[in-house]
UniProtKB/Swiss-Prot annotation:
Protein name per the record: Large ribosomal subunit protein uL1y
Matching PANTHER family: RIBOSOMAL PROTEIN L7AE FAMILY MEMBER
GO cellular component term, pick one: peroxisome
Subunit structure: Interacts with the GTPase NUG2.
Length: 216
């Protein structure tokens, strides 16, 4: 049972949109769900991690890189998608600094089957440590569909602190779309928690430049 009041969410979204209208920015602001947890010990309790695909893409400009075989690299080129082949990965020479820099340059990675198997050998644990191990793409599925699916997927991962922020939308979306994304994100997050809603201390929605609005 969700304890999230639809009214509170709708009000917060309307306020956020209204405030952003007052001061136009020259970029599209992201809307972030900020989460505070309670009765959770990151040292003892299981640190959860989970991903959910939202109905609407929160960050259309999300940077994705295809680590591909020849065919996937060619497809990525045609789509204007950043890509690297095995030779380019070999050049990083497992250098921790370079792998870290690569991980920081993109929000997510996709990889062909033949490449994904070689990643630990070619790059070491760097991408995994950054929580950005590539998603497998086979030749049977459309690369474009996979890119859109990746853009629509958000990840909740508890690290050492009891608060986190996840991008769940942007201000170019309609209020209804934002509402659907927020609702789905919150319900998914709560399902990951040991005691569900009893572990939620507070929830806020915030646009990049705006003040946070409490929704729970």
């Amino acid at each position: 049972m969700s304890k999230l009041q639809s009214e509170a969410v709708r009000e917060a979204i309307t306020t956020i949109k209204g405030k952003s209208e007052e001061k136009k920015r020259n970029f599209v602001e992201t809307v972030e769900l900020q989460i505070g947890l309670k009765n959770y010990d990151p040292q003892k309790d299981k640190r959860f991690s989970g991903s959910v695909k939202l109905p609407h893409i929160p960050r259309p400009k999300m940077k994705i890189c295809m680590l591909g075989d020849a065919q996937h690299v060619e497809e990525a080129e045609k789509m204007g998608l950043s890509n690297m082949d095995v030779e380019a990965l070999k050049k990083l020479n497992k250098n921790k600094k370079l792998v870290k820099k690569l991980a920081k340059s993109y929000h997510a990675f996709l990889a062909s089957e033949s490449v994904i198997k070689q990643i630990p050998r070619l790059l070491g644990p760097g991408l995994n440590k950054a929580g950005k191990f590539p998603t497998l793409v086979s030749h049977q599925e459309s690369l474009e569909a996979k890119v859109n699916e990746t853009k629509a997927t958000v990840k909740f991962q508890l690290k050492k602190v009891l608060c986190m922020g996840v991008a769940v939308g942007n201000l170019s979306m309609e209020e209804k779309q934002l509402f659907q994304n927020v609702q789905m994100s919150v319900n998914f997050l709560v399902s990951l928690l040991k005691k569900n809603w009893q572990n939620v201390r507070c929830l806020y929605l915030k646009s990049t430049m705006g003040p946070p609005q409490r929704i729970f």
